[in-house]
A protein has these predicted regions:
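Intrinsic-disorder-associated, low-complexity terminal segments enriched in Asp/Asn/His/Tyr and depleted
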Residues: 6-8
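Nucleotide-activated chemistry modules centered on ATP-dependent adenylation/adenylyltransferase
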Residues: 2, 13-212
Length: 212
């Protein structure tokens, strides 16, 4: 009996998952002309397929705000790859600070969490909140993030955080699940075409050390 209840509960959780890719398509259909969108990019390779898809409907500007990336040399290397992508697609860019100290303060008590554990949503929120704030200050119609392209990132969590910070700052968050429609596969193809460096860990040294 208990096993049947457990299976039922797990099936309910699966059923409750929101199709954020479908929600994005619905929002795009409602657009009255091109809108401005601030895209938080976690790295150049992930941004490729996201920009390719969004650029058809939005005037995209990328913000590269990733204080979780360590060490600083790695941050700069990934930023350099990001600039290659922006040049390819002719995308505007907003420079942002490397607030690694703030990231460390927010996550130090979660340093022993595994990659994909409780530390990750804190990191997502830090980056999405900054993006929403900048989007509001610069009168963007929408903001969103490339984070959902990764098969290792939970799009349900990312979109819920995006929605919450969007409501906080009064700017529309565009729901996404860029890994859908073979988005991740497309990012690999575009990365090869552009000869991009693809890192082998997400960003923070906590996660890198846990994965080694």
């Amino acid at each position: 009996m208990e096993m049947k209840q457990d299976i039922h509960l797990r099936s309910l959780v699966i059923e409750m998952k929101i199709n954020y890719d479908a929600l994005m398509e619905e929002e795009i259909k409602k657009l009255d002309g091109r809108k401005t969108l601030l895209l938080h990019s976690c790295c150049g390779p992930c941004s490729t397929t996201c920009i390719e898809r969004l650029n058809k409907y939005f005037d995209v500007t990328v913000i590269y705000y990733n204080p979780n990336i360590e060490p600083f040399d790695e941050y700069l290397k990934r930023k350099q790859e990001q600039m290659k992508v922006l040049k390819k697609f002719n995308i505007n860019f907003i420079e942002s600070d490397y607030d690694n100290g703030d990231f460390r303060n927010l996550t130090c008590e979660l340093k022993d969490e595994p990659e994909g554990g409780k530390r990750c949503p804190v990191c997502f929120k830090m980056r999405l909140e900054k993006t929403a704030k900048v989007a509001k200050e610069n009168n963007f119609d929408y903001f969103t993030t490339t984070l959902t392209v990764s098969p290792h990132k939970d799009s349900q969590i990312i979109n819920k955080i995006g929605e919450a910070v969007g409501e906080k700052y009064g700017v529309k968050y565009l729901y996404t699940d860029f890994k859908k429609k073979e988005g991740y596969k497309r990012s690999i193809e575009l990365s090869k075409e552009l000869d991009l460096y693809r890192q082998n860990y997400c960003g923070c040294l906590y996660g890198k050390e846990k994965g080694e």
